[in-house]
């Protein structure tokens, strides 16, 4: 079912630009008004004779009852008001629609003609004659009230948030969030330093957007014996990806409405997936690479010299998210919305019903925004399929998360079991992997 605020465009033309292609909101708003509210009394100059009758669109003979009209429509409106006549249309009330003059060789629908007189703004109080019946007086008052209501409506400031405002507002918010947390991932830790904090220290801590603000960084460099320089490492960027995802979660509205235990549960479930899609999108969008690559240029994945054949197979499987991103040519807006949907997952087990409702409400906003964006950019034909394809990426992320946890446990139980010395990525990494 489509969201309430979505209007499906009629075009099916595909547009790959991340810019929003939004319909003319003035036209949509005008079409959405009831016919009785389309009336707007025009301020007309009495110095010139109008060209066309506002009712039948034939030549006008002057201003009659404040509206440019012909003698026939003037007389019809006057007689209808004086007699208090009410008419019924048998053809969907569209007999006088269009822009061409009405065919006078055929009998004109009286109901549509009278409605057109009222919409054009003919003023019943300008009729200088006594009402013939009580019905006439009632009809005159009814028309005057309807027209006054319409004028009041048109003169009242309307505070209307269109779906354009909704979409652009949410996308703008996510863009700001991404710009804030991206340096946490792309900048990396200072060479030779490690973040030794654990998950429980991070969850309820204030938002940190710079590594200068991280307390108690531990300096423990891995030095190359030949050159004496600190060895480049991709491991710190894995930690940085997880850290950026956790800090990212603190900027959502739900973060201030749920308890610490619920935050921990949600973070344990979503951090790996958020970090994976961030790494994949960075490799594709920033590095233009068809392999997962860290910001320092090193390829992602366990080193072959230590993990052997198992590591090689796992490294190949890690590319699935990137391959999916490449196949769908994900743009930045789609990436941001998809990552927000991944994080805001109310279906995580052990969350209370009240917490699920809070998270679910926020997730619904991002799902609706993504659907709206797809419909507006890809049209009513390709939009729904694009939306479905983007959501299908979530199943790839969930599969990748399971594979990552399985490989981590396998490596600790077998490959690294008898290792004399190996460097753990971080306490945070191990806690997330083993959760």
Curated annotation (Swiss-Prot):
ZnF (NR C4-type) intervals: 53-73, 89-112
Highest taxon above the source species: Eukaryota
One GO term (biological process): cell differentiation
Encoding gene (name): nhr-136
Location(s) in or outside the cell: Nucleus
Protein name: Nuclear hormone receptor family member nhr-136
Residue spans binding DNA: 50-129
GO molecular function, one term: zinc ion binding
A cellular component term, taken from the record's GO annotations: nucleus
Record PANTHER family: NUCLEAR HORMONE RECEPTOR
SUPFAM superfamilies recorded: Glucocorticoid receptor-like (DNA-binding domain), Nuclear receptor ligand-binding domain
Pfam family, one: Hormone_recep
């Amino acid at each position: 079912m489509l969201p309430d605020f979505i209007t499906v465009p009629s075009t099916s033309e595909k547009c790959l630009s991340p810019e929003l292609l939004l319909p003319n909101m003035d036209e949509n708003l005008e079409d959405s008004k009831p016919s009785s509210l389309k009336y707007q009394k025009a301020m007309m100059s009495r110095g010139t004779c109008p060209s066309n009758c506002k009712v039948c669109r034939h030549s006008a003979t002057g201003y009659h009852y404040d509206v440019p009209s012909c003698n026939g429509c003037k007389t019809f409106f006057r007689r209808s008001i004086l007699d208090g006549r009410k008419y019924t249309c048998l053809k969907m009330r569209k007999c006088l629609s269009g822009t061409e003059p009405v065919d006078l060789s055929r009998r004109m629908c009286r109901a549509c003609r009278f409605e057109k007189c009222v919409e054009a703004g003919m003023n019943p109080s300008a009729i200088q004659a006594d009402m013939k019946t009580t019905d006439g007086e009632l009809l005159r008052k009814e028309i005057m009230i309807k027209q006054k209501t319409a004028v009041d409506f048109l003169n009242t400031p309307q505070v209307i948030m269109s779906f354009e405002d909704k979409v652009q507002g949410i996308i703008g918010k996510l863009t700001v969030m991404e710009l804030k947390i991206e340096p946490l991932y792309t900048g990396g830790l200072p060479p030779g330093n490690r973040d030794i904090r654990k998950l429980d220290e991070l969850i309820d801590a204030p938002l940190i957007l710079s590594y200068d603000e991280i307390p108690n960084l531990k300096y423990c460099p891995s030095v190359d014996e030949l050159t004496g320089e600190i060895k480049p490492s991709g491991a710190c960027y894995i930690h940085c990806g997880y850290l950026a995802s956790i800090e990212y979660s603190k900027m959502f509205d739900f973060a201030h409405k749920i308890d610490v235990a619920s935050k921990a549960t949600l973070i344990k479930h979503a951090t790996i997936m958020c970090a994976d899609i961030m790494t994949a999108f960075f490799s594709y969008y920033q590095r233009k690479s068809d392999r997962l690559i860290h910001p320092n240029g090193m390829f992602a994945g366990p080193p072959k010299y230590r993990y052997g054949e198992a590591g090689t197979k796992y490294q190949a499987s890690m590319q699935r998210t990137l391959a999916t991103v490449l196949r769908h040519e994900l743009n930045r807006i789609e990436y941001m919305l998809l990552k927000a949907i991944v994080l805001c997952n109310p279906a995580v087990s052990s969350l209370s019903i009240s917490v699920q409702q809070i998270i679910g409400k926020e997730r619904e906003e991002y799902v609706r925004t993504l659907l709206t964006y797809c419909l507006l950019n890809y049209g009513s034909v390709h939009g729904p399929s694009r939306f479905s394809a983007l959501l299908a990426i979530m199943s790839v992320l969930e599969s990748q998360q399971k594979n990552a946890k399985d490989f981590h446990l396998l490596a600790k139980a077998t490959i690294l079991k008898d290792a004399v010395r190996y460097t753990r990525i971080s306490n945070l990494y191990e806690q997330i992997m083993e959760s």
